[in-house]
Amino acid sequence: LNGEFCVFDTETTGLDPGVEYLTEIGAVIVRNGEVVEEFDTFVKPGKPITSKITELTGITNEMVADAPSEAEALKAFLDFVDGRILVGHNAHSFDIRFLRAAAKRSGIEFEPTYIDTLTMAQAMYPGLHNYKQGTINKHLELPAYEAHRACEDSAALGRIFCVMLKDLEEKQVTAVSGINTGLGGNREVLKKKYY
Protein backbone atom coordinates (compact mmCIF):
# COMPACT_ATOMS: atom_id res chain seq x y z
CA LEU A 1 0.00 0.00 0.00
CA ASN A 2 3.04 2.25 -0.14
CA GLY A 3 2.82 2.77 -3.90
CA GLU A 4 1.30 5.63 -5.84
CA PHE A 5 -2.40 6.14 -6.50
CA CYS A 6 -4.26 8.75 -8.53
CA VAL A 7 -7.26 9.99 -6.54
CA PHE A 8 -9.72 11.76 -8.83
CA ASP A 9 -13.14 13.34 -9.18
CA THR A 10 -15.23 14.64 -12.06
CA GLU A 11 -17.94 17.23 -12.47
CA THR A 12 -20.48 16.84 -15.27
CA THR A 13 -23.46 18.43 -17.00
CA GLY A 14 -25.79 15.79 -15.50
CA LEU A 15 -26.12 12.19 -14.35
CA ASP A 16 -26.34 10.09 -17.54
CA PRO A 17 -22.97 9.55 -19.28
CA GLY A 18 -24.80 8.63 -22.48
CA VAL A 19 -26.13 12.16 -22.97
CA GLU A 20 -24.17 14.31 -20.50
CA TYR A 21 -20.55 15.49 -20.53
CA LEU A 22 -17.57 16.17 -18.29
CA THR A 23 -17.07 19.79 -17.16
CA GLU A 24 -14.08 19.31 -14.84
CA ILE A 25 -11.53 16.65 -13.91
CA GLY A 26 -9.53 17.01 -10.70
CA ALA A 27 -6.93 14.61 -9.36
CA VAL A 28 -4.12 14.22 -6.85
CA ILE A 29 -1.27 11.75 -6.63
CA VAL A 30 -0.98 9.98 -3.27
CA ARG A 31 2.49 8.60 -2.63
CA ASN A 32 3.29 6.69 0.57
CA GLY A 33 0.22 8.10 2.29
CA GLU A 34 0.73 11.74 1.28
CA VAL A 35 -0.73 13.99 -1.43
CA VAL A 36 2.25 15.01 -3.58
CA GLU A 37 0.87 16.35 -6.90
CA GLU A 38 -2.34 17.96 -8.13
CA PHE A 39 -4.13 18.18 -11.48
CA ASP A 40 -7.21 20.16 -12.46
CA THR A 41 -8.78 21.05 -15.78
CA PHE A 42 -12.09 22.35 -16.94
CA VAL A 43 -13.58 20.52 -19.92
CA LYS A 44 -15.58 22.13 -22.73
CA PRO A 45 -18.76 20.01 -22.67
CA GLY A 46 -20.74 19.01 -25.74
CA LYS A 47 -23.78 20.91 -24.45
CA PRO A 48 -24.55 23.98 -22.30
CA ILE A 49 -24.38 23.73 -18.51
CA THR A 50 -27.82 24.22 -16.96
CA SER A 51 -28.44 26.71 -14.16
CA LYS A 52 -29.20 23.77 -11.83
CA ILE A 53 -25.73 22.27 -12.44
CA THR A 54 -24.09 25.71 -12.09
CA GLU A 55 -25.87 26.11 -8.76
CA LEU A 56 -24.57 22.70 -7.61
CA THR A 57 -20.96 22.95 -8.87
CA GLY A 58 -20.32 26.66 -9.31
CA ILE A 59 -19.11 25.91 -12.85
CA THR A 60 -20.55 28.28 -15.46
CA ASN A 61 -20.67 28.17 -19.25
CA GLU A 62 -18.23 31.09 -19.27
CA MET A 63 -15.70 29.10 -17.19
CA VAL A 64 -15.63 26.25 -19.74
CA ALA A 65 -15.98 28.32 -22.93
CA ASP A 66 -12.23 28.25 -23.66
CA ALA A 67 -11.49 24.97 -21.85
CA PRO A 68 -9.81 22.01 -23.55
CA SER A 69 -12.04 19.67 -25.54
CA GLU A 70 -13.16 16.43 -23.93
CA ALA A 71 -10.46 14.51 -25.84
CA GLU A 72 -7.71 17.00 -24.90
CA ALA A 73 -8.73 17.06 -21.23
CA LEU A 74 -8.96 13.26 -21.05
CA LYS A 75 -5.51 12.85 -22.66
CA ALA A 76 -4.01 15.35 -20.20
CA PHE A 77 -5.65 13.51 -17.29
CA LEU A 78 -4.43 10.11 -18.48
CA ASP A 79 -0.91 11.53 -18.90
CA PHE A 80 -1.13 12.69 -15.26
CA VAL A 81 -2.44 9.27 -14.16
CA ASP A 82 0.50 7.61 -15.93
CA GLY A 83 -0.77 4.06 -15.36
CA ARG A 84 -1.39 4.44 -11.61
CA ILE A 85 -4.37 2.79 -9.93
CA LEU A 86 -7.28 5.24 -9.88
CA VAL A 87 -9.18 5.99 -6.67
CA GLY A 88 -12.61 7.61 -6.72
CA HIS A 89 -15.67 7.97 -4.50
CA ASN A 90 -18.67 6.28 -6.10
CA ALA A 91 -16.30 5.79 -9.03
CA HIS A 92 -17.92 2.58 -10.23
CA SER A 93 -21.41 4.05 -10.59
CA PHE A 94 -20.46 7.56 -11.71
CA ASP A 95 -16.96 8.86 -12.51
CA ILE A 96 -15.59 5.79 -14.30
CA ARG A 97 -18.75 5.60 -16.41
CA PHE A 98 -18.28 9.23 -17.49
CA LEU A 99 -14.59 8.74 -18.24
CA ARG A 100 -15.40 5.62 -20.27
CA ALA A 101 -18.07 7.49 -22.26
CA ALA A 102 -15.68 10.39 -22.91
CA ALA A 103 -12.95 7.94 -23.95
CA LYS A 104 -15.31 6.15 -26.32
CA ARG A 105 -16.43 9.43 -27.92
CA SER A 106 -12.77 10.48 -28.23
CA GLY A 107 -11.44 7.17 -29.56
CA ILE A 108 -9.18 6.74 -26.51
CA GLU A 109 -8.61 3.34 -24.90
CA PHE A 110 -9.58 3.42 -21.22
CA GLU A 111 -9.86 0.27 -19.10
CA PRO A 112 -8.48 1.26 -15.71
CA THR A 113 -7.80 -0.58 -12.50
CA TYR A 114 -9.52 1.44 -9.79
CA ILE A 115 -10.57 1.51 -6.15
CA ASP A 116 -14.02 2.79 -5.16
CA THR A 117 -13.79 4.47 -1.75
CA LEU A 118 -17.58 4.38 -1.35
CA THR A 119 -17.56 0.59 -1.28
CA MET A 120 -14.35 0.65 0.76
CA ALA A 121 -15.89 2.96 3.39
CA GLN A 122 -19.02 0.79 3.64
CA ALA A 123 -16.78 -2.16 4.49
CA MET A 124 -14.42 -0.25 6.80
CA TYR A 125 -16.81 2.06 8.67
CA PRO A 126 -20.13 0.23 9.14
CA GLY A 127 -22.99 2.10 10.76
CA LEU A 128 -22.58 5.57 9.24
CA HIS A 129 -25.94 7.17 8.39
CA ASN A 130 -24.77 7.57 4.76
CA TYR A 131 -21.55 7.18 2.81
CA LYS A 132 -21.31 10.51 1.07
CA GLN A 133 -17.76 11.78 0.85
CA GLY A 134 -18.52 14.65 3.24
CA THR A 135 -19.91 12.24 5.85
CA ILE A 136 -16.78 10.09 5.70
CA ASN A 137 -14.59 13.20 5.85
CA LYS A 138 -16.42 14.29 9.02
CA HIS A 139 -16.31 10.76 10.50
CA LEU A 140 -12.52 10.73 10.06
CA GLU A 141 -12.33 14.23 11.61
CA LEU A 142 -10.61 15.76 8.59
CA PRO A 143 -10.84 19.46 7.64
CA ALA A 144 -14.02 20.61 5.90
CA TYR A 145 -13.79 21.40 2.18
CA GLU A 146 -15.84 22.91 -0.65
CA ALA A 147 -17.85 20.06 -2.20
CA HIS A 148 -18.86 19.70 -5.86
CA ARG A 149 -15.69 21.04 -7.42
CA ALA A 150 -13.43 18.32 -8.77
CA CYS A 151 -10.21 19.97 -7.57
CA GLU A 152 -11.47 20.32 -3.97
CA ASP A 153 -13.21 16.93 -3.91
CA SER A 154 -10.16 15.05 -5.20
CA ALA A 155 -7.81 16.75 -2.71
CA ALA A 156 -10.24 15.96 0.15
CA LEU A 157 -10.63 12.37 -1.06
CA GLY A 158 -6.84 12.11 -1.22
CA ARG A 159 -6.70 12.97 2.50
CA ILE A 160 -9.52 10.50 3.23
CA PHE A 161 -7.77 7.76 1.25
CA CYS A 162 -4.52 8.33 3.18
CA VAL A 163 -6.40 7.67 6.45
CA MET A 164 -8.10 4.63 4.90
CA LEU A 165 -4.69 3.24 3.87
CA LYS A 166 -3.46 3.56 7.47
CA ASP A 167 -6.65 1.85 8.70
CA LEU A 168 -6.11 -0.96 6.16
CA GLU A 169 -2.58 -1.52 7.44
CA GLU A 170 -4.03 -1.97 10.93
CA LYS A 171 -6.21 -4.72 9.43
CA GLN A 172 -3.02 -6.38 8.14
CA VAL A 173 -3.81 -5.50 4.51
CA THR A 174 -0.42 -4.59 3.08
CA ALA A 175 -0.90 -4.90 -0.69
CA VAL A 176 -3.46 -3.55 -3.12
CA SER A 177 -4.23 -7.08 -4.27
CA GLY A 178 -5.43 -7.90 -0.74
CA ILE A 179 -7.97 -5.10 -0.40
CA ASN A 180 -11.04 -7.10 -1.48
CA THR A 181 -10.27 -10.17 0.66
CA GLY A 182 -8.88 -8.11 3.54
CA LEU A 183 -12.11 -6.19 3.95
CA GLY A 184 -14.23 -9.32 3.86
CA GLY A 185 -17.78 -9.61 2.70
CA ASN A 186 -18.75 -9.71 -0.92
CA ARG A 187 -17.89 -6.13 -1.82
CA GLU A 188 -15.56 -5.56 -4.74
CA VAL A 189 -13.58 -2.47 -3.72
CA LEU A 190 -10.72 -2.95 -6.16
CA LYS A 191 -11.83 -3.27 -9.79
CA LYS A 192 -9.13 -4.66 -12.03
CA LYS A 193 -8.91 -4.11 -15.74
CA TYR A 194 -9.78 -7.15 -17.73
CA TYR A 195 -7.33 -8.41 -20.35
Region annotations inferred by a language model:
Residues T119-Q122, K138, R159-C162:
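Generic alpha-helical structural context detector
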Residues E109-A121:
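Conserved beta-strand -> loop -> alpha-helix junction used to position metal-binding or nucleic-acid-contacting
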Residues E72, A121, S154-A155:
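Short secondary-structure boundary/hinge segments and terminal tails
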Residues R149-C162:
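Acidic, divalent-metal-coordinating active-site segment for phosphoryl/phosphodiester hydrolysis
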Residues L1-P112, P126-H148, Y194:
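Conserved non-catalytic scaffold segment of RNase H-like nuclease domains
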Residues L1, I160-Y195:
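Acidic two-metal-ion nuclease catalytic site recognized across multiple nuclease folds
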